[in-house]
Amino acid sequence: MNNLVGATPEETAFFKSFIDRHSVFLTAGFSEIAVSENTKLEPEESLVTSVLGSQKKASIERSTYAGFRYALNLLLKSLLTNVAVTNHKHSPDFKLRGVIEGFYGTPWTHEQRLRGLAHFSDFGFNRYLLAPKDDPWHRYDWRSALSEDFLNRVSELIAEGRKNGVTVAVAISPGLTVEYSDAHDVSAIMVRFKQLHSIGVREFGLFLDDIPARLQSEKDSAKFDSIMQAHSYYCNAVWAELKKLDSDNSLAICPLQYHGKATEEYITEFGNALDPDLALIWTGREICSEYLDVSDAKVFKAKTNHIPLYWDNYPVNDVAMLHELHVGPIEGREKGLHNHSLGYFANPMDRFELSLISLSTIGDYLWDTQGYDAQVSWEYSLTLLMDNSGDRAAIRNLLRGCFESCLRVNPAPDFYAMLEEASFSWKTGKPAQAAQIVETHSKQMLNDVATINSAQFSQPHWREESLKWLTKYEAVGKALQEIAGILSTCGVSKNSNLSGTKADLVTITSIRASLNSDPTRIFGSGLDMTLAELADEIRWSLTS
């Protein structure tokens, strides 16, 4: 099974590691995969055919190793979805498709980063940018040389990235303490960039985000008329040295103002003062943007003289979003945005394992903006990341209650549908039916909790990372049992309104207070609003 014909030694070696990670190739793989060269294809392109049925066969045409690597993703999808492809041209929309470890909070471990590179490649990404906000080397100790241990770890990341077709980039953020007019501070950051260059890094980041918006040094105040002027001077000076070091180097700048309409004074002046060869990072209208669209990208280009390099703050859930769990699919990113963007980096959560769910959907969008379907992509991400169907069904129910985010989508589609059905039943004089609806959902939720908490659950890391939300999920499940009990004993007045007791009101009030005392966000605000309506109706019956 999985006889690879015509592949290079490098491709053959990678294929062995790929099928070890994806068991479907071992249980239901292809009898033969024929690999051939097609020099007319772009580096990341491939032509892929998969024949399913009793005699599974496949073929890959590619011009480079990268084309072969990404073609495997399509064959994997063909097996997992049982959908054959015929001479399919597999080609990405966005040329730069990246993950940036740029969140506040506990940085990922080295082991997670190494595993992440394989996952990112499975999702179609080709960049990983190391820029953890709370790791001292990134923002606080930037004037000191990087340690040998750190450089060794980055070297390991580069090697693993190369195997997976993912380029590793590194960013430094000196803005908290830098003196922009001091040539020594240009030299200081170049010490690090030279160290990184010596181990193979060619893509760098210079970040000036989340720093004081005024000049802090007397020398800087004397030399520059504005913070923008200081920033552009310093960035251009560093870039001149980086180019001198190696013409293959590139540098991405994250500006002080990294979101807005792109018509603001700082970003327009900064962009126009910046060397046009520098990439300029932008997060959209907001720090965490509900949407990214073509029209805003065009404005950015017109005003700053730079094509935006998007840093999308999703699924990150740091700072004010700590009580949310961002596990939904990416939405609100316009089709065709790649035609007006230098590239796209997704900023994940510190919860490495659960970040992979949304990152998988982002990879799908970046590869094919026209064909991207958020819900289809999300369901596939679960199938890709969790083999056990029973475990997958249980965790799916939990995760579908955690869609609340800056994307402003339905925070809990299935739960809201249940609430709507139950409230319609009691409002139309059928409280017993409403009780049954709520009771059925409650039982399912508590069964989900039992499955996820079992010793046999196949993804214990998912359980650990979602523990806060799982705990509240269980609390809601138990609360629904009490609500079902109330509804089952409610009467119906002659005008079809519910009639209940003062004890019912006390119970509902207690449930709301208990659930609201836990700030963990799950199911949005729908349950609390529904319980408020139920209490109001019972209260009205007691006073009428």
Regions found by a protein language model. Give the residues of each.
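C-terminal functional modules
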Residues: 371-544
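Short acidic low-complexity segments
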Residues: 23-38
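Feature activates predominantly on carbohydrate-active enzymes
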Residues: 2-14, 18-21, 46-194, 198-202, ...
